[in-house]
Regions:
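Helix-loop boundary and gating motifs at the non-cytosolic
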Residues: 6-39, 45-46
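Helix-breaking motifs and short loop linkers at transmembrane-helix boundaries and internal kinks
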Residues: 40, 72, 93-98
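Residue-level signature of mid-helix packing/kink "hotspots" within the transmembrane helices
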Residues: 54-62, 146
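Helix-to-loop junctions at the C-terminal end of transmembrane segments
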Residues: 60-72
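Structural signature of the two symmetry-related core transmembrane helices
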Residues: 75-89
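Paired small-residue
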Residues: 87, 98-106
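Intracellular juxtamembrane helix-capping segments at the cytosolic ends
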Residues: 113-126
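Glycine-rich segments within core transmembrane alpha-helices of 12-TM secondary carriers
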Residues: 136-146
């Protein structure tokens, strides 16, 4: 283990976390507009997309603990980031409100997995003497992404 906080691995994980949150929060103001204009969903019902996303993000939590114990953390993180990228790109192909809601469900699950796997990896690559500072820096990367 390195004896400093800012190792290359830690900086990469923080950058990935920053970009993850940026990609998600750039979609938030756009999705209701797309649902209303392109898919014909009433504006009053567009908030359901956020409820579904949030539920999916929280439901995956207990399963994440199992997956991280069984499989390598790095692969769980990479897979969830890959699914998140595919889901974000998939919004361009959506043709119905049902497909959009399913895509939000997939994106919520992958975001929940990516966020928690990222935290786990950040803790793994941080020296125990810098763990508190590492957690603060990692969480600030998420805050800046918002």
């Amino acid at each position: 283990m390195a004896t400093k906080l800012w190792t290359l691995h830690f900086m990469r994980i923080c950058l990935a976390n920053l970009l993850l949150f940026i990609s998600l929060y750039l979609l938030y103001p756009v999705l209701p507009v797309v649902m209303a204009s392109r898919l014909g969903v009433p504006v009053s019902q567009t908030g359901g997309i956020y409820i579904l996303f949030t539920l999916a993000m929280f439901v995956i939590g207990p399963f994440h603990a199992y997956l991280v114990d069984v499989y390598k953390r790095k692969y769980i993180c990479m897979l969830s980031f890959g699914i998140m990228v595919a889901a974000t790109a998939g919004y361009t192909l959506v043709q119905s409100a049902t497909h959009l809601l399913l895509l939000c469900l997939v994106q919520g699950i992958s975001f929940g997995m990516a966020a928690t796997a990222g935290i786990t990896l950040a803790i793994d690559v941080t020296n125990s003497t810098f763990r508190s500072a590492g957690n603060v820096v990692f969480s600030w990367a998420a805050r800046l992404g918002m």
